């Protein structure tokens, strides 16, 4: 049974369609990276899953329970971290956490233990007596995570948790999320920091204009986005002749000679090849073609496609 599921989920604001028949499945223990341009529908989706917003049509489920009909049973299962933390700034950290623990009906010594545990998990124990308004942005975001962990939810819904954080705070947040994943939490996280999502998440969804363009593993999205290869080919000499040979191979879109700094302090030249192996031979055949034609290879590498590149290839940058 999926831990998070949406079925033809739609949200309208008057004439504006923020979500358009969104179908999403996230299994227990998954860390799902939700990617899309501003205005794509990420926050709307997360707010519906957090039971804070009613869908116009369609269905959303948490652990098999239907949002809108079983919210009372759903809320103990989820922890929602918005992109901006609303804090009672005149409280100290322990008061803040104890206040929310009481709201979850955690009382007495159990409350104190739970507060100590989440402070330790989020590495905020040394700030237990500090006022909330004295915390840095990164610490406040970790405090927001500590707050939603008080009742030990199965599902974490996180809307841009690293937004506005400096590099050190982002690293600390990433390590915290890795630990939560090791604990078996199901995590849905939206973020614009795509390299970190690629490292953290095992599943990714790309949304644009309220529609899900892709839903699958990071490896699958990289394969799907890789409509062509970018190859760096080095030969000892006869660059133009090698380039002309490659240009005649079916599937080669473009060949150019570019400068290459090999890292040894000497500037050389390489062939920059755009190649689509769906239209011709496999990319692994190209070295043999060159060698059999009398060229000596000094380099044959493929430019990696990362999550940022995949995102740019699969989206058009459109918003509602």
Regions found by a protein language model. Give the residues of each.
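Solvent-exposed beta-strand sheet faces enriched in polar/charged residues
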Residues: 7, 234, 258, 301-303
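Conserved protein kinase catalytic domain
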Residues: 75, 119, 222, 287, ...
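C-terminal coupling/interaction segments
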Residues: 274-320
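ABC transporter nucleotide-binding domains
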Residues: 2-6, 11-209, 213-214
